[in-house]
């Protein structure tokens, strides 16, 4: 029966306090009533404590049940997240075979990898459909006095991607092991605590991913250089020897011709944000018609989930974020970096004189045409506007996840607070003892004292909280299921 006193225990307790024959009957009944109240209080406390534990551990119980059925489920989920990050990193590798109008589908590397958290598949599709300017290889500077040959020579020396810092201080002394192996548990110090082991696992994974990105890009760089050398050899042979195989289909190396190189960079301009020189045409802000390169545009995104910035009244106490309603969390659209207009968006009108690469002619077959470069006009209704939400369609999912996390934390804090009031060992004992010692209360004192909630009232409050949490959990699962269904192609 646990800690609840049984009938025999109660009788023994009564025998211990049983008075002699001179002890009056009223006093004996008072002692018996006191023991009954204490026993009943202990039963309620244990029952309510169990209810609190059910509320605190309700979601964990479902997770543990699934883990009991499949011991690898949590590891699989963690591994899936790591594989998704690796797949995203592979999408950011610049490939010489993936070009559109002289640009590429992946960024040159003007910004750090951590800031490239956009949906790479969405961005690539926008570039291929020519709704967004491609990622161009930038020039640090440009001189209008450069001749055609000088400009082509400079462009020939441009790399496919910016250089990596192979000795980052962040990953100094971090083991990476064999990158060909998918697991690296042997690199983790098992003498550390579970929390420290998880931190070490995450750090090793980041270091390994960084090294993999370098290797992936270096492989593409080698392919890029090999194709350059091969095209140069073919060009020198054709200029010295008459080509009798001109009727045979030529191999597409996906490299720009000299005419395309000249066309690209002679009509370029400087991005006002990163101050690098890019070929045109640029993306243009829809609100104030200012140019912005794609490298900079993909950095712009919504603010992280936060509570509204209310005006602070110095006469009133400030409310902590943990006490606020999680449903008040918000995330405003990005503002224009030039004029601060809300809901920043850009438009892009592709060039009409150099449709090369994917969806166009081979880049090495382009012949120079002296035609004006198209410029986007935000006033034209047929030009689609692209926002930061377009390239980060999961912003609402992240906002709802943060709201759910705060709801769970708030519910846990409420349950713990009520639990502490219920299982306080001195709470019911002091109250019951005071009743037995002072059976007659001063009515004026009781009236002035604020009424304490009874055990039954607190139990009812816990039941309502449990029902509310259950309904919220069911509603969140239903919304998540509907959202996943709508996102399927």
Curated annotation (Swiss-Prot):
Q: Which UniProt keywords apply?
A: Cytoplasm, Phosphoprotein
- What cellular component terms from Gene Ontology apply here? cytoplasm
Instruction: Output the CDD domains linked to this UniProt entry.
Output: SIP5-like
Q: What stretches pass through the bilayer?
A: none
Residues modified as Phosphothreonine: 183, 433, 438
Return the Polar residues bias intervals. Answer: 21-32, 57-69
Where does the UniProt entry say this protein principally localizes? cytoplasm
Q: Which InterPro entries match?
A: Sip5/DA2 (IPR039301)
Residue segments, region Disordered: 1-44, 57-84, 419-489
Q: Which residues, if any, are the signal sequence?
A: none
The Basic and acidic residues compositionally biased stretches are 461-477
Q: Which residues carry this modification: Phosphoserine?
A: 13, 436
Q: Where in the cell is it found?
A: Cytoplasm
Tell me which PANTHER family the record gives.
Answer: PROTEIN SIP5 (PTHR31315:SF1)
What this protein is reported to do is described as: May negatively regulate the SNF1 kinase by promoting the interaction of the REG1/GLC7 phosphatase complex with the kinase. Deletion of SIP5 promotes resistance to artemisinin, which is probably an indirect effect of an action on the electron transport chain.
Q: Which family does it belong to?
A: Belongs to the SIP5 family.
Q: How does it assemble?
A: Interacts with SNF1 and REG1.
- The protein, known as: Protein SIP5
Ranked from the top, the taxonomy reads: Eukaryota, Fungi, Dikarya, Ascomycota, Saccharomycotina
What gene codes for this chain? SIP5
